[in-house]
């Protein structure tokens, strides 16, 4: 039952339309039948496509994959165990054991050739350097000779000085000009000790 209201400025009109019960019952039946059909369709589809069983099927698939991997590994091992002459396409054209020493020999010859060139240059350069070293050695020898003479003089003047002090005393003045820095440091240490020893000795000397 439907009611339609039409409003105007002067009057209000109401129109009513009555729907018989037979029509409503037929429409309800159609709706119910459609619901039943949908339910049947759902049941049929569920029967056709059963739900998967993941927990039961997964181990079987893993086992199949494991067996496939094992077969592949076995075939790989068989291929590697075969002699190299069986597969000429897979083996390299030249053997590795022969090609490696050739390259090493070539590298060794190059390195040997390079190492031969610098020594010749060094020998030619070292000749004047050796003369300079000999000249320096002679100068040092002269300085040491002067130092030994100075030592003798000091030993005559101060007979009570110890041997370490005597060795450190001549390294003063002009004798330490051509001496390396490390020796100078050592001599200065001995010099300080000798000065202290000389002071103690001079205190006991008679005037």
UniProtKB/Swiss-Prot annotation:
| Keyword Membrane annotated | yes
Report any one BP term from Gene Ontology: neuron differentiation
Q: What is its main location?
A: membrane
Query: Any idea which UniProt keywords this protein has?
Result: Cell membrane, Membrane, Neurogenesis, Nucleus
Q: Which InterPro entries match?
A: Vexin (IPR040470), Vexin_dom (IPR027900)
Pfam families named in the record: Vexin
Q: Could you tell me which residues belong to the region Disordered?
A: 65-104
Q: What does this protein do?
A: Required for neurogenesis in the neural plate and retina. Strongly cooperates with neural bHLH factors to promote neurogenesis.
Q: What family, per the record?
A: Belongs to the vexin family.
Per its record, how is this protein called by name? Vexin
Q: Which organism is it from?
A: Mus musculus
Gene encoding the protein: Vxn
